[in-house]
């Protein structure tokens, strides 16, 4: 018996999206970003499905170790880098590469003797102003890494775009100009483009692209759809109706009597709530798909349940499926209705939601 609620993950869609990104960046290798539990799609499941990716990007060392333990032998890169000096020996032992973005990491690399050098990606802050060395710091930082026997050569080079998901924003081109000027003539691989860079800034694709959300069939642009770019949604978040009740005009529903019916109708209770990661702040009218039609959320989302207005002529039954987002109800549309981004919806699902690979 299949569990509810569950996130149904499509192998076909994941593989299609990776192939599509290869088409969009034919001269680049693809570092598939699978941090945050594969954007909620299952870390190991996604990595094993995308076994023809050229490498995988993670945020935390624990994520990388989970992939190694699961048998993944591909290139792994810690996008946040290492946090503690003891992490360096673990990186060497498990052949994990690291971003270097801060003075404290330089100091740790200079105060340890590793059994073999670690592969480093030096991060330039070209305008994001979150992680990375400023243009003024770059030359001295690069020379320190070059002089360090704990650092494998050549040193690879990277930056991250702040506004690539705004295709008309000129700051992305300026960030690329800053980066290209700094690293001109240096050896090593380059990577600039995230999902938005890969989709909208072909000139930024370089040696590697680092797609995250696009791998899962979702557009990185608010109000846009992945399908417009040839991507396929990889997740269907589904649950079921556990109760249907007749509801009279003037009756309220849910905590705080937040919603009151204007006319007679039928309400359906769906077994999913904020305890599963569905947003409590989903407003009235947020769409849910039941038996092929869109029905609106009414009342407040509670911990384990939410309520939808099925309509007066509903023929739905207890046990029928309710789709919170997926192929027929894009997560981008749900996110826009709620006032958030699709990234947040897919990554905030809790362990109560079973992740099922088809």
From Swiss-Prot:
Protein name stated in the entry: Alanine racemase
Keyword Transit peptide belongs to the record: no
Family: Belongs to the alanine racemase family.
One term under GO cellular component: cytosol
Entry function: Catalyzes the interconversion of L-alanine and D-alanine. May also act on other amino acids.
Origin species: Shewanella piezotolerans (strain WP3 / JCM 13877)
Gene3D superfamilies registered for this protein in UniProt: Alanine racemase (3.20.20.10), Lyase, Ornithine Decarboxylase, Chain A, domain 1 (2.40.37.10)
SMART domains in the record: Ala_racemase_C
Positions where N6-(pyridoxal phosphate)lysine occurs in the chain: 35
Highest taxon of the lineage: Bacteria
């Amino acid at each position: 018996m299949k569990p509810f609620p569950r996130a149904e993950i499509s192998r076909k869609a994941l593989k299609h999206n990776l192939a599509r990104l290869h088409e969009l960046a034919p001269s680049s290798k693809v570092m598939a970003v699978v941090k945050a539990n594969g954007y909620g799609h299952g870390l190991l499941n996604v990595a094993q499905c995308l076994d023809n990716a050229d490498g995988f990007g993670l945020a935390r060392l624990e994520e990388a170790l989970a992939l190694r333990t699961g048998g993944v032998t591909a290139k792994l890169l810690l996008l946040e880098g290492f946090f503690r000096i003891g992490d360096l020996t673990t990186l060497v032992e498990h052949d994990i590469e690291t971003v270097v973005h801060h003075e404290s990491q330089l100091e740790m690399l200079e105060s340890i003797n590793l059994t073999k050098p670690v592969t480093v990606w030096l991060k330039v802050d070209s305008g994001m102003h979150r992680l990375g060395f400023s243009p003024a710091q770059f030359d001295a930082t690069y020379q320190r890494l070059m002089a360090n026997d704990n650092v494998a050569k050549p040193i690879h080079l990277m930056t991250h775009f702040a506004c690539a998901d705004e295709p008309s924003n000129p700051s992305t081109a300026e960030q690329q100009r800053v980066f290209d000027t700094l690293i001109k003539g240096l050896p090593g691989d380059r990577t600039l483009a995230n999902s938005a860079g890969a989709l909208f800034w072909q000139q930024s694709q370089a040696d590697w692209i680092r797609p995250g959300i696009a791998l899962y069939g979702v557009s990185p642009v608010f109000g846009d759809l992945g399908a417009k770019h040839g991507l396929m949604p990889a997740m269907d978040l589904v649950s079921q109706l556990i109760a249907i009740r007749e509801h009279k005009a003037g009756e309220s529903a849910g905590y705080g009597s937040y919603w009151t019916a204007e006319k007679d109708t039928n309400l359906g209770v769906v077994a999913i709530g904020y305890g599963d990661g569905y947003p409590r702040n989903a407003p009235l009218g947020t769409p849910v798909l039941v038996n092929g039609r869109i029905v609106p959320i009414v009342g407040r989302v509670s911990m384990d349940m939410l309520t939808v207005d099925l309509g007066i002529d509903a023929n739905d039954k207890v046990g029928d499926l309710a789709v919170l987002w997926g192929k027929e109800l894009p997560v981008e549309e749900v996110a826009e209705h709620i006032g958030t981004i699709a990234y947040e919806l897919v990554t905030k699902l809790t362990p109560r939601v079973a992740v099922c690979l088809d």
